[in-house]
Design a protein with these regions (language model features):
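Conserved phosphate/anionic-ligand binding catalytic regions in large, soluble enzymes, centered on
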Residues: 272-285, 289-290, 334-338, 424, ...
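Short loop-beta-helix segment that forms the pyridoxal 5′-phosphate
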Residues: 108-112, 129-148, 548-571
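Conserved PLP-enzyme active-site core in the AAT-like
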Residues: 10, 145-310, 372, 385, ...
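TRNA-binding/sensing appendages of the translation machinery
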Residues: 28-42, 260-265, 691-694
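Flexible, glycine/proline-enriched loop segments at strand-loop-helix junctions
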Residues: 107-115, 136-139, 168-175, 215, ...
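Non-catalytic terminal extensions of PLP-dependent enzymes
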Residues: 1-25, 37-77, 86-102, 108-111, ...
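Cysteine-centered functional microenvironments
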Residues: 106-107, 526-529, 559-561, 614, ...
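General small-molecule cofactor/ligand-binding pocket signal
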Residues: 136, 194-198, 380, 409, ...
């Protein structure tokens, strides 16, 4: 053991004496003996991973800085959905760089998530204020995927008559960002949706359309009045989605006011860096009548057991973890951390600050337009917010711009497009004008006053924005800092205690991995900048793709998918494209085990596949006979199998190769869900097992944080025969020669996050990666063995061992004690712990995944809490008013009148060590039903 290595900092148990004690509890003599009992010998790798030895933290810090310095972010006026902006230092320091914010999990356990729930409610409120809509979700992945989600939402909202009539056409205005159009192409094809791409102002509805998509302002910057178009669409029973720039809505009439049914877009320019494409918070807002068809998470307002206001995730019955293939979307992880930052940006700036930012961009555009007109240039758009589309010789302008360290966008050889932003200065405007003047051999004219606004009078905003108290109360940095801290203290994160959520892999997000995200060379790159300006990024991306391919045993990798669910979808679409290339597009049946996570069937449904469920046996394994029967039955139409390995039940199934062979023999491909890859790395891999494609959750196995509900990255790795079909992009060269259309707005997805996983691999090296996997398995088996006398492990492998997680059986608690696993989860909050995964994949169980990062002392505390809670359950049997069912207990309740049969100390300090760092839940048990029945998804005074 040497604490000079990253591995010994990352892995929680490095002390040999502690490790021996754990192995003794398990009943094995060595780690190797345990691994041999856990992983079938037939799939064990025969040689170590072909990766370099791990760097030290110091070496990596120097290395990653050098890579960042090889990026050369020029002053970007490219626009196209990505803009330089002022990221408030107070938000960057207190949120983006703060582990209390970035290490928390999605707020399913709302009582210990009130801080980030309020931050997300602020985001929703800001979106509603700007768009003029009635209900908003708390983020999507990016603008392109948000638009695609809106398309499918409009498709789902078709009336019965429209469905009977076979309305499958979607009008798309051609003045749309190309990456957004590409996403629409990707998502529409599996549903048989026909895109009609045309000009909105000359289009006549035929009655075959179910919806329409327009951009506001348009891709070329034009501000257009869509009111008559919307009226015509509605007259033909078609709904309209507006893809709207949020900053522009500080000055422009809200889409909700001119009739749009859905409003989507990106919130990037409200306080989050470009980051070479992400992560950013996509958004969606709509009419309340459509709330049950809306994708993504919605934060609502409810009450707790004591009648206090409490926040929660509302209307969860729409989502994939419950509705599976009938869900509104496959989206799971979104962009919660970025949405929180946007919310704080709006809190900090308020209405005045937002208008000032918008006016800065608009004034710069107006001043430049006037100056260019004086030089004889022709603008294709006369009414604009921040973007000018200019007739000019692109090659000449580009050469002069690069000399000055400036990037524009060049839609064609005869046009130049430039977008201004909130950080544009008068000197920069003068520089741009001088550049265009030089191109014509002229001298620029200096104006003494600002040009008048070009916004049409009918489209100028008259309604107020950000009127809620929260957007007026925290305008100084001291006030904002304290507000952020108040919210922070209401949440449990990895900064407080272990989060043992099964199937979520809440491991350490090391500071050495997070620091590079704040480097200017990574933050300030535009995703559509020439790649020669992004040498550091391109080297990092190429190396990371190689490393992930090596780790998975596959041939190639795409980093474009920006969530695990997006990776699932991308992998299935690649398989689909492969079958189509062989003239077998009719292969559309996908086999999915009954135990699969809900995203699997939801993603398959979005990929246009017919789902056939495979049974599981009494031990939780795939019923191989049932799988073979169904593979043979559907052999002529079999697309493939989606399988999680180790299984969702936490065990390595010994017949996995037999399963893979059966699918291949029937003509199908094998998609492996990488959710549990933390139990494979360095010991086995999907390629060695026989899978054709797998997705990875970099925010699980590879040390990216969860961010309270995202962002994440979900790359796919594929075998050689699938390499040609990796996702492409309409602006940057990426993907295979026959690549599917884009699955994310940016060519390399959420590229700003990639240094995390890159560093994780570089600092652990092949040996460290293997050790991390081994210790994840050791920790899970230690806890399973140590708890065996009190909690039975529901499933185990043939040798009685589990993989990297285990399912604790609480199925008798309701009968024996009148207490269910939800009550146990709430009681754990009083002990300062986030509960494990509840009732998945088996009802009334807890799925525990300790990961390799937890120290033995922390695991022991968690187990002591579980055992003590069981004693409390035994003592409370038959009593309605008991310490477990009333949990969690707030400080206010403890300090108030007390009539319970148990003491205040028993409620708040049931074990001695809790007093050392007591976490106080901010609210008591929340009434979920009330929040759904009385949906409020914005701040209330």
């Amino acid at each position: 053991m040497s604490f000079d290595t990253f591995a010994d900092r990352h892995i929680g148990v490095s002390n040999p004496d502690e490790l021996k004690a754990m192995l003794d509890t398990i009943g094995v003599g060595s780690v190797d003996e345990l691994i041999a009992q856990v992983i079938p010998q037939s799939i064990r790798l025969k040689k170590p991973l072909d990766l370099p030895a791990g760097m030290s933290e110091y070496e990596f810090a120097a290395h990653i800085r050098a890579l960042a310095d090889r990026n050369h972010p020029l002053r970007s006026f490219i626009g196209m959905g990505y803009y330089p902006c002022a990221v408030p230092a107070a938000v960057a320091r207190n949120v983006f760089e703060n582990p209390a914010w970035y290490t928390s999990y999605t707020p399913y356990q709302a009582e210990i998530s009130q801080g980030r729930l309020e931050a997300l409610l602020n985001f929703q409120t800001a979106v509603l204020s700007l768009t003029g809509m009635e209900i908003a979700n708390c983020s999507l992945l990016d603008e392109g995927t948000a638009t695609a989600e809106a398309m499918l939402m409009m498709f789902a909202l078709r009336s019965r008559d429209a469905v009977k009539e076979g309305r499958t056409q979607l009008f798309v205005d051609r003045n749309l960002f190309p990456q957004t159009l590409d996403l629409l192409l990707t998502r529409s094809e599996p549903f048989g949706i026909e895109l009609i791409v045309d000009d909105y102002d000359c289009y006549e509805f035929s009655g075959k359309e179910f919806g329409a998509v327009v951009q506001y302002p348009a891709a070329d910057g034009a501000v257009r009045d869509y009111a008559a178009f919307v009226e015509a669409a509605h007259a033909h029973d078609a709904k309209v989605t507006a893809v709207a720039d949020l900053l522009s809505l500080a000055l422009l009439k809200a889409p909700g006011e001119w009739g749009a049914d859905i409003c989507v877009g990106s919130a990037q320019r409200l306080g989050t860096p470009m980051g070479f494409g992400g992560p950013h918070a996509g958004y969606m807002a709509t009419r309340e009548a459509y709330k049950r068809q809306m994708p993504g998470r919605i934060i609502g307002v409810s009450v707790d057991r004591l009648g206090n206001r409490a926040l929660l995730m509302a209307l969860q019955m729409r989502e994939q973890h419950i509705k599976r293939e009938r869900a509104t979307s496959n989206i799971c992880t979104a962009s919660a951390l970025m949405a929180s930052m946007v919310g704080f940006y709006c809190v900090y700036n308020g209405a005045e600050g937002l208008r000032r930012a918008a006016e800065t961009a608009h004034t710069a555009a107006c001043d430049t337009a006037r100056a260019l007109a004086a030089l004889g240039y022709k603008l294709t758009n006369q009414h604009f917010f921040d973007t000018l589309d200019i007739e000019a010789e692109a090659a000449v302008i580009q050469s002069l711009a690069l000399e000055r360290g400036i990037n524009f966008f060049y839609p064609s050889e005869e046009r130049v497009r430039l977008s201004f932003d909130e950080v544009t200065t008068p000197d920069e405007v003068a520089e741009v004008v001088a550049l265009f003047a030089e191109a014509r051999g002229r001298k620029p004219k200096v104006a003494r006053s600002h040009a008048p606004s070009t916004l049409p009078e009918a489209l100028r905003r008259t309604s107020p924005i950000l009127i809620e108290e929260v957007f007026r109360s925290h305008r100084s940095e001291s006030a904002l800092m304290r507000y952020i801290k108040r919210l922070e203290y209401r949440d449990i994160s990895l900064a407080d205690s272990m989060i043992s959520l099964g199937s979520c892999t809440m491991k350490l997000n090391a500071a050495a991995l997070m620091q590079p995200l704040s480097l200017a060379g990574f933050q300030n790159m535009h995703p559509f900048a020439p790649v020669e300006q992004a040498e550091g990024y391109m080297e990092l991306i190429a190396a990371l793709e190689r490393d992930l391919a090596t780790i998975t045993g596959l041939a190639a990798c795409s980093l474009q998918p920006n969530s695990g669910a997006a990776g699932e979808y991308a992998g299935l679409m690649v398989i689909r494209a492969y079958h189509q290339s062989k003239g077998q597009g009719y292969r559309n049946v996908i086999l999915i085990p009954a135990s699969a996570h809900g995203t699997n069937p939801a993603s398959a449904a979005m990929a246009g596949m017919k789902i056939v469920t495979v049974a599981c046996d009494a031990k939780g394994n795939i019923d191989v006979d049932d799988l073979k029967t169904k593979a043979e039955e559907h052999a002529s139409e079999l697309c493939g199998l989606m399988v999680t390995y180790p299984s969702t039940h936490g065990v390595f199934e010994s017949r996995i190769r037999e399963i893979v062979d059966a699918v291949h023999d029937a003509g199908g491909q094998v998609y492996m869900d990488g959710a549990n890859m933390n139990a494979q790395v360095g010991l086995t891999n999907p390629g060695y097992i026989g899978a054709d494609v797998c997705h990875l959750n970099l925010h699980k196995t590879f040390a990216m944080p969860h961010g309270g509900g995202g962002p994440g990255v979900g790359p796919i790795c594929v075998a050689a025969h699938l390499r040609p079909f990796l996702p492409s992009h309409p602006i940057a060269a990426t993907g295979g020669d026959e690549g599917i259309t884009a699955v994310a707005s940016a060519p390399w997805g959420s590229a700003l996050l990639l240094p995390i996983t890159y560093g994780y691999i570089k600092m652990l090296g092949g040996d460290g990666l293997r050790r991390a996997t081994e210790m994840a398995i050791v920790n899970a088996n230690y806890m399973s063995s140590a708890l065996a006398a009190e909690y039975r492990t529901y499933y185990s492998g043939e040798t009685g061992r589990v993989g990297h997680e285990m399912i604790l059986d609480l199925t008798n608690f309701k009968h024996d004690y009148g207490i269910d696993c939800g009550d146990i989860a709430h009681r754990l909050m009083d002990y300062g712990f986030h509960a494990p995964t509840l009732s998945f994949p088996v009802h009334e169980t807890l799925m525990v995944e300790p990961t390799e990062s937890e120290p033995k002392a922390e695991m022991d505390r968690f187990m002591e809490a579980l055992v003590h809670i069981k004693r409390e359950c035994e003592a409370a049997a038959g009593q309605e008013d008991n310490v477990v069912r009333n949990a969690p207990h707030t400080a206010v309740e403890i300090a108030g009148e007390w009539s319970h049969p148990y003491s205040r100390r028993e409620a708040a300090f049931p074990l001695g060590w809790i007093a050392e760092a007591k976490f106080w839940p901010y609210v008591s048990k929340i009434d979920n039903g009330y929040g759904d029945r009385n949906l409020v998804c914005r701040c209330t005074e």
